[in-house]
From Swiss-Prot:
Chain ranges on the Extracellular side, renumbered to this chain: 319-362, 463-492, 552-652, 723-779
Annotated protein name in UniProt: Anoctamin-7
A Pfam short name: Anoctamin
Residue ranges of the TM segments: 298-318, 363-383, 442-462, 493-513, 531-551, 653-673, 702-722, 780-800
Chain residue ranges for the region called Disordered: 24-50
Record's miscellaneous remark: The term 'anoctamin' was coined because these channels are anion selective and have eight (OCT) transmembrane segments. There is some dissatisfaction in the field with the Ano nomenclature because it is not certain that all the members of this family are anion channels or have the 8-transmembrane topology.
Length: 860
């Protein structure tokens, strides 16, 4: 049933305490609610209280004391009113607030230290359906490579003995009326872990209004965007710097353990302590690092095979008959001009280019393309198994279906409510047809941005053509000979600049569109945002390589009848073919982007951190030498999330798979980059970022489906690359029909200029094409076209069939995990039946135990 949400009044009620908890004579909450008139009603007594609750969250705002003398009244007063209203509503919600100020003559920094009493934690833990432990289990984490090396008796240099390994738990959704069931409930100070406390505080901050909710005046995110507060963050677990080696290892904090055993560069070859990462940063961050480590490990065999294929190409260069014929052809092949103002040239002058092309274009690339297609399929299949194991171990397998709550921004602005068929609760609702309309409108904007990318690509194509003409007219013999390659290389650099600029613009635009679409959950919001940005980035990054791979040199025409684009003659492939140019483009974009990103990730945080510390020290000049924890954490950088990290890796995955036939070294460069990336990201989270709020997740979200789509696209792309952009099939055809040793193959691939062109220039010349003397396609062209199309069909059918077979052969969930899940369901049903029988025998009617894990067998 749909219900319109009341819009006449805007209550600041965060916790409804009007009805006592079933089965528990008194309320466990200790909160208050207030109407707009300011009336307060304090909730009844607590379950218990903690004398000195820890600092759970910090709010910061800066004040320019000099502006008081000449204030810009309107904005300052509005911010002050919003801030005071927000803080008052936090007090009404039951939070403890302590303010600390640091100031000098010019400026002041105000720190609001927030703590949640036991009652508030209990209420929101139940409201948010947080899962809390019922029973401790030994940690059963295992690694297949560690198991294999142990079985073989080989020392494992990858193993790292990390102290304080987090145990596993049976857990279920928290209910305060069943508090005694939960592990550690007798100690209120440690019952809620720091990550759980942060989640609860962030939920309160995200929902608390500071004005009329329907006008969007609610939540800490909006206040940060408006500049009312300059930061909001939970505190780190002390400094990351490690105590001297002589100290006891057990004395290390969680942050110090992560720094010592994970974030240091010297640990690049060690297994990641994922359970420790999950305990400190939450499941979402841990799953990212699990995926990154898994993907990097799988890149190792791909890099080895790719390097072998490339080295094979290096040896084949000097024994390849067509390449040797080209280099020793002297003045045998007089080639037609490459542009309207260019001169005739000798094919032998392109010897170096032909040899470079042979490095990437040989029979080994066919094998490598098949290998990488199956590699990608197996990578995703085994990641599904790894993900299922981690989700079960971290107790988040059903997070999206059952646990996840509506986004605070959605809940505050949704026009009506509806019954959730899974949980049976009334939740905010936005009509799906309205969302679809908004998504269609957003897709129009996406198409416009894609059109901008295509316009940039066309401009790059024209730039290459014009640059080639200009450089070819140079008096320098070297520049003139390499005109095409110079134009291509500089065009790749210009294209990279366009890519980076357009990326920044569209990410901001996609955020606005996704917020407008009103997605119910944070997962749905992130998936929609991710899909928008990825589609744009896919076109942005891959448009130029796709043009070189599949379009360049295809629509050139022939001497005397060349095709043009805006009056400029279409580009031709160089003497070595377009495959070598594609490899160059991939290396410039992929490696260039990786270098730029890594430099940014190293230098930008350092520079920002230095600036932040410099500003902070100026504002607290004369204060104590040892800053308070909240002051030290405020000097760190705000956490920017995982979106850009995932995007970088997924785009890299596309370069590694979609165009791998042109660049077998791509997996090697990706592997080297990722070894750096893992520790770089780890250092950012441990040392340079403020602590993020721990978020739960059950998988890597829509990124997995994007990776699966790229895998399918890679099969088709490599099939067409090998068929139409490589000389592999023409060489095979020639060796079968004419000469097995490929002698004469070079002459076979060159057509003669038509008589009209020859008579106009008083000179005959050759050009790369399968055409007759009149410029028409020869029978050989049509025969090769049929062979190419047949190869594409056979290649993709073989790969897709093999991939489907492997998909069926490898279960998505490991058998051990499947047995554990079934066992838990059985125990849960058994516990429910026993509980009902017990209640029926005693005649007691009460609330049933929370259903989740095998520990539901605990008595009621």
């Amino acid at each position: 049933m749909l219900r319109k949400q009341a819009g006449e009044e805007d209550s600041v009620v965060l916790i409804d305490m009007t009805s006592p908890e079933a089965g528990n004579g008194c309320s466990y909450g200790s909160t208050a609610q207030a109407s707009e008139a300011g009336k307060q009603q304090v909730a009844p007594s607590r379950v218990g209280s903690s004398a000195n609750p820890p600092i759970d969250f910090v709010l910061v705002w800066e004040e320019d004391l000099r502006s008081r003398e000449n204030p810009t009244q309107d904005k300052t007063d509005t911010h002050e009113i919003w801030r005071e209203t927000f803080l008052e509503n936090l007090r009404v919600a039951g939070l403890k607030i302590d303010q600390r100020d640091v100031q000098d003559e010019a400026a002041a920094v105000h720190y609001i230290l927030l703590s949640a009493p036991w009652a508030v934690l209990c209420y929101y833990a139940e409201d948010l359906r947080l899962k809390l432990p019922l029973q401790e289990l030994p940690n059963q984490a295992s690694n297949w490579s560690a198991t294999l090396l142990e079985w073989l008796g080989i020392p494992n240099i990858l193993l790292e003995n990390v102290p304080d390994t987090p145990p596993e738990y049976y857990s279920c959704q928290f209910k305060a009326s069943k508090l005694q069931w939960f592990l550690g409930s007798d100690n209120q100070d440690t019952f809620f872990t720091s990550t759980k406390r942060h989640q609860i505080l962030f939920e309160i901050l995200a929902k608390t209004p500071y004005g009329h909710q329907k006008k969007g005046l609610f939540g800490i995110d909006q206040l940060l965007a408006e500049g009312v507060f300059s930061a909001a963050f939970p505190l780190h677990d002390g400094p990351f710097s490690v105590v001297p080696e002589s100290s006891q290892v057990l004395g290390l904090t969680q942050r110090q353990v992560l720094f010592k055993h994970w974030a240091r560069w010297g640990k690049w070859r060690k297994y990641q302590p994922l359970d420790h990462v999950r305990r400190y940063f939450g499941e979402k961050v841990a799953l990212y690092f699990a995926w990154l480590g898994f993907y990097t490990g799988w890149l190792l065999p791909a890099a080895v095979v790719g390097t072998v294929v490339f080295l094979a190409g290096c040896f084949l260069v000097f024994s390849d008959v067509p390449t040797q014929e080209l280099c020793h052809s002297s003045d045998t092949f007089d080639m037609c001009p490459l542009c309207s103002d260019c001169s005739f040239w000798l094919l032998s002058s392109a010897c170096t280019l032909a040899q470079a092309g042979r490095l990437f274009d040989h029979g080994g690339t066919v094998f490598f393309s098949l290998f990488m297609a199956l590699w990608a399929v197996l990578l995703l299949e085994y990641w599904k198994r790894k993900n299922a194991t981690l989700a079960y171990r971290w107790d988040c397998s059903d997070y999206e279906d059952i646990e996840e709550r509506p986004r605070p921004q959605f809940a505050a602005t949704a026009p009506m409510t509806a019954l959730n068929p899974i949980t049976g609760e009334d939740e905010p609702y936005f009509p799906e047809k309205n969302r679809v309309r908004r998504m269609l409108a957003g897709s129009v904007v996406l198409l416009m941005m894609v059109a901008v990318v295509i316009m940039c690509l066309v401009s790059i194509i024209l730039y290459r053509a014009v640059m080639a003409i200009i450089v070819s007219k140079s008096n320098n013999a070297f520049l003139s000979a390499w005109a095409s390659r110079i134009a291509s290389l500089t065009g790749s650099v210009v294209n990279l600049v366009f890519i980076l600029i357009l990326s920044k613009v569209y990410v901001i635009l996609a955020q606005v569109l996704t917020r407008w679409e009103m997605h119910r959950t944070q997962t749905a919001f992130e998936d929609a945002f991710t899909l928008k940005v990825f589609i744009f980035q896919f076109v942005n990054f891959y448009a130029s390589p796709v043009y070189i791979a599949f379009f360049k040199g295809r629509f050139v025409g022939y001497p005397g009848n060349y095709h043009t684009l805006f009056g400029v003659r279409n580009e031709e492939c160089p003497a070595g073919g377009c495959l070598s140019e594609l490899a160059q483009e991939l290396l410039v974009i992929m490696v260039g982007k990786q270098i730029i990103n890594n430099v940014q990730e190293v230098l930008v945080p350092k520079l920002k951190g230095c600036w932040q510390k410099l500003c902070s020290r100026r504002k607290k000049a004369g204060m104590g030498a040892n800053p308070a924890p909240w002051e030290a954490d405020y000097e760190l950088l705000p956490c920017e999330g995982l979106f850009h990290e995932y995007l970088e890796m997924v785009l890299q995955f596309g370069f590694v798979t979609i165009f791998v036939a042109a660049c077998p070294l791509a997996p090697l460069f990706a592997l080297l980059n990722n070894w750096v990336e893992i520790r770089l990201d780890a250092r950012k989270f441990v040392c340079e970022y403020r602590r993020p709020v721990a978020e739960r997740a059950q998988d890597i979200g829509i990124w997995f489906h994007i990776l699966a789509g790229l895998t399918h696209l890679a099969v088709i792309s490599n099939a067409f690359l090998l068929a139409f952009s490589s000389d592999f099939l023409p060489r095979v055809y020639y060796s079968w029909t004419r000469a097995p040793d490929l002698r004469g193959f070079l002459n076979f691939t060159l057509a003669r200029a038509p008589p009209t062109f020859t008579s106009a220039h008083n000179r005959t010349c050759r050009y790369r094409a399968f055409r007759d003397d009149d410029g028409h396609y020869s029978p050989t062209y049509w025969t090769l076209l049929a062979i190419r199309l047949a190869f594409v069909i056979v290649f993709e059918h073989v790969v897709f069939s093999t991939g489907r077979f492997l998909d069926l052969l490898v279960p998505d969930i490991p058998e051990s995990v499947e047995i554990k899940v079934k066992r838990e369901y059985y125990l849960a049903k058994q516990a429910l039946a026993d509980n009902e029988a017990l209640l029926g025998a005693t005649g007691v009617k009460g609330e049933q135990p929370p259903s989740s894990e095998p520990s539901l067998g605990l008595p009621a």
